[in-house]
Amino acid sequence: MRISIAAIGKSGQSPEHDLVHRYFNRLPHKGALIERDSSKTSGLAGKRDEGKRLLAALPAQCKLVVLDENGVNLSSVKWAEQISSWRDAGIRDAVFAIGGADGHSEDVFAAADKTLAFGVQTWPHMLVRAMLAEQLYRAEMILARHPYHHA
């Protein structure tokens, strides 16, 4: 199963960008890092525009996991179990989506198969990308029974 990260906003050259790529490039079944520009329009119209562009960039019939502060909190082991169950079910693509500054549009939430959170705190978007890439790599290492998870 290919695993991709889709995000609103360009990462540019930054320490966070380097960290995202460090972990993402270690994934054995990586898909794509999909970035879409933030909308030039603010408010609800901007959020809808971002959502439309994000959804248009996704692979057909992918499992869409939306990151949102109101999502479910899962342990690293539970993330790994979820990824494993999708692989076992023959899912070809899973995409983890990070919204723009105003969050995800209703269309993105409606298309989501799962909504996850990184705790109750609010995190900078670029840091969330790095945290997500690391957790996806950690999930792969858990499934491979590699000592990384307990190192």
Protein language model annotation of sequence segments:
Residues G31-V95:
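S-adenosyl-L-methionine/SAH cofactor-binding core of RNA-modifying enzymes
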Residues N25-R26, W86-A89, M141:
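Arginine/glycine-rich "motif VI" loop of SF2 helicases in the C-terminal RecA-like domain
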Residues I5, V65, G99, L132:
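Conserved RecA-like P-loop NTPase ATPase core
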Residues E106-H150:
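Structured adenosyl-cofactor binding patch, chiefly the S-adenosyl-L-methionine
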Residues M1-L27:
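N-terminal beta1-alpha1 ligand-phosphate binding loop
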Residues P28, Q61-C62, A112-D113:
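Short, well-ordered alpha-helix to beta-strand connector turns
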Residues S11, E69-V72, G100-G103:
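Short glycine-rich anion-binding loops that position phosphate/pyrophosphate groups of nucleotides
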Residues H17-D18, K47-R48, S76-A80, F109, ...:
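Conserved strand-to-helix beginnings and helix N-cap segments that scaffold or border functional pockets
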